[in-house]
Swiss-Prot record:
One Gene Ontology term from the biological process aspect of the record: rRNA base methylation
Primary gene name: rsmH
Location within or outside the cell: Cytoplasm
Function, in words: Specifically methylates the N4 position of cytidine in position 1402 (C1402) of 16S rRNA.
Alphabetized InterPro entries for the sequence: RsmH, SAM-dep_MeTrfase_MraW_recog, SAM-dependent_MTases_sf
A Pfam family matched in the record: Methyltransf_5
Keywords: Cytoplasm, Methyltransferase, rRNA processing, S-adenosyl-L-methionine, Transferase
Family: Belongs to the methyltransferase superfamily. RsmH family.
Full protein name: Ribosomal RNA small subunit methyltransferase H
A single GO cellular-component term on record: cytoplasm
UniProt-annotated binding residues for S-adenosyl-L-methionine: A32, G33, H34, D51, I82, D99, Q106
Leading EC class: transferase
Catalytic activity: cytidine(1402) in 16S rRNA + S-adenosyl-L-methionine = N(4)-methylcytidine(1402) in 16S rRNA + S-adenosyl-L-homocysteine + H(+)
The protein's Enzyme Commission number: 2.1.1.199
């Protein structure tokens, strides 16, 4: 069963999982592109997976049927999933995978409201969640809009874009992503090669789904989860996420937890969780970029939790 979504950095992910034995957790199952490839490559691994998108889960249940009892799938986020697993399951986890991005199918499906040309204005990963992009665009104050465009879209003209939205909705509700994109403007920002609409959509999507909080909670849960001898592989798609992962991996690799500026280490200098395996993030090869232009912004970082 072919996935409607092209998994990014697949060869790189497979290279890290090829020799593992035990369980691996896919924190963002999606359409099971990475997980099905890992299971096919390595018969010594079993999958425990979670996702919040019921459409993706239903697709993946069928896609992963050939692997039978090697697969468990939960409609959950990662931090909730940990509480559902037995101590034996957790102690046998040898790999954790998270692909922190929107799937191609979600972007391309008109009713999900992620794409610039969508007739819907939604952007929810979990369609059972009440809060949507419509609520942000039509309900947020000027200051709230400026905050998300500045902090999550890294837009220099955040106030100008917020003004455009306020002025437009004063004439009537904004009901589609296509309408919103035209209000913001789709011409590329000079020197950045991307339109303000794309960055504003990113900001709204992050706000709607609490994506940065979800990522932080994911990393917190891994840190406190009691995992041993376990790979942590995380794919991000923009600088905000990558920065969070990079800084957390640095913290985990730090053996000294003494306060900054202290003259002599007094903590024992043995507090590292493990080691960073990717000093610089892995990015898409030229051949992958030729096949999937959406892989351009993907970055893979890998950490090995010690045994």
């Amino acid at each position: 069963m072919q996935s409607p979504h092209i998994s990014v950095l697949l060869d790189e992910v497979l290279s890290f999982f090829k020799d593992l034995r035990g369980n691996f957790i896919d924190c963002t199952l999606g359409y099971a592109g990475h997980s099905s490839a890992i299971l096919s490559q390595n018969e010594n691994l079993n999958l425990i997976a979670c996702d919040k998108d019921i459409e993706a889960i239903n697709f993946s249940l069928k896609k992963l049927e050939p692997f039978g009892s090697r697969v468990k799938i939960y409609k959950s986020n990662f931090s909730e999933l940990i509480s559902k697993l037995s101590s034996d399951e957790i102690s046998n986890v040898r790999g954790i995978l998270a692909d922190i991005g929107v799937s191609s199918l979600q972007i391309d499906k008109d009713d999900r409201g992620f794409g610039l040309g969508s007739s819907a204005l939604d952007m929810r990963m979990d369609k059972e969640r009440g809060f949507s992009a419509y609520d942000v665009v039509n309900g947020y104050s000027f200051d709230e809009l400026v905050r998300i465009f500045r902090d999550y879209g890294e837009l220099k003209n955040a106030s100008g874009i917020a003004n455009k939205i306020i002025n437009a909705r004063n004439l009537g509700e904004i009901t589609s992503a296509k309408e919103l994109a035209n209000i913001i403007g789709i011409a590329q920002i000079k020197g950045r090669g991307v339109s303000p609409a794309i960055l504003a959509f990113q900001a709204i999507r992050i706000e709607v789904n609490g994506e940065l909080d979800e990522l932080t909670n994911l990393l917190d849960s891994i840190e406190k989860g009691g995992f041993k001898d376990c790979l942590v592989t995380i794919i991000t798609f923009h600088s905000l996420e990558d920065r969070i992962v990079k800084e957390r991996f640095k913290k985990w690799a730090n053996s000294c937890i003494c306060p900054p500026g202290i003259y002599r280490c007094e903590c024992g200098n043995n507090h590292e969780l493990g080691e960073i395996l990717t000093k610089k993030p892995l990015t898409a090869s030229q051949s992958e970029l030729a096949q999937n232009s959406r892989s351009k912004s993907a970055k893979l970082r890998v950490f090995k939790i010690k045994g």
